[in-house]
């Protein structure tokens, strides 16, 4: 194989998009969509950019009537902390493989320093912000919700499929995710309509389309019509992504038994926090909408679920959970709180740090607060989180 173009300038009329995710020390997932039916598609993977000395997946079938021409490859037995390149071989045409290639880097379970970008609220798949992110030296991108703004209010899986296709096919976002592995948790506009919850008409279709299109980490609830909460680690950092939409009860209900997470997910979340103690000095909770807010100040955040927020906050304090921070989206702003305003437990003191990062491609808006370091609404914004872990007692984190 011969590499002809920079990775961010490649095009191939046979491939709509490629993206990777679910990256661990020795595994990764690549999902792609092609523009024609084929009964012989395989993934070519190499540690070399020109794809020399490659390994090959088993052959897959792409059929518009069977799988929407989607192909997903689960990669195993990879080497830790290693850069990989990949491409699709379609109909045994080896010459076209390097026309459209992507890359990802595996992680390590040992202490490691790394940086990643995070952001939310992407109404458009095009914009200079995606190209700026692509030029950062990052290990992955964390999308914290509203990957698209289709606001689908019907149980029509083809509408959800089209939403992913429109955002990824031939767009700046698609090029970013081809070359930067991602982790992604939805919020309301990409799960269902505005402010949506478990009563959304398209709940089942949304869940299934996510599992079809997104190269996600294993879903602890299983597969099929299930919530999409998941977790993964990079070195000694544990990431916990909660599904704040598809199990949530309506926020305007008057019952004190309202829930964001649902009983099963909440038990899983608490257990993850307990299991992390002594193993992961840093825990990153990806919570897609505002935690810091008071009832009457917002229309969709945790302020409408004060009893459950208090329960979770008390659990964190009572179990002496250390090293927790939160990444959030939904609000179209950059905002940081150092813990001054995030404690909703019955015990006085500081809470955990909170970082909102957005909007990628949406006009600015302010939600929640107050935030100790201020809030800055705007479009074309994202965050960076840098982790320095030398294996000692402390891990240094910088948000910017």
Give residue ranges: language-model regions.
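Metal-dependent phosphoester/phosphodiester hydrolase catalytic core
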Residues: 4-400
